[in-house]
């Protein structure tokens, strides 16, 4: 619980939505994953078929997660998509390009910071296959 919020205030905010959970899943959160607009033009100049963020994720971030899996238990990689657009462009990007899924079947403890965001996740045991597929289709 956040130190600046006492338990009574927390109960008022969440009321009946405050739940005790019977099971939790080990995971790692991908935080503030976004492209630097100052480098988009440089990346676009290379003429590659994939965008910068997708390439960074599959080429650099996923191998780091795989290294981490050698020493800690982790079942999911997850993020909170800050997408308030009517057509959910960011959510579609995370789904189509990075292979995250909306996790509506799980009850999620959402931090206050991410309260308006969409929780998305994917199983770490599927990352290698998805990464391989990304590189097989890189120049398609």
Model-derived features: positions:
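Non-catalytic substrate-recognition and accessory regions of acyl/acetyltransferase enzymes
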Residues: 1-48, 59, 63-140
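Short alpha-helical segment within the catalytic ATP-binding CA
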Residues: 55
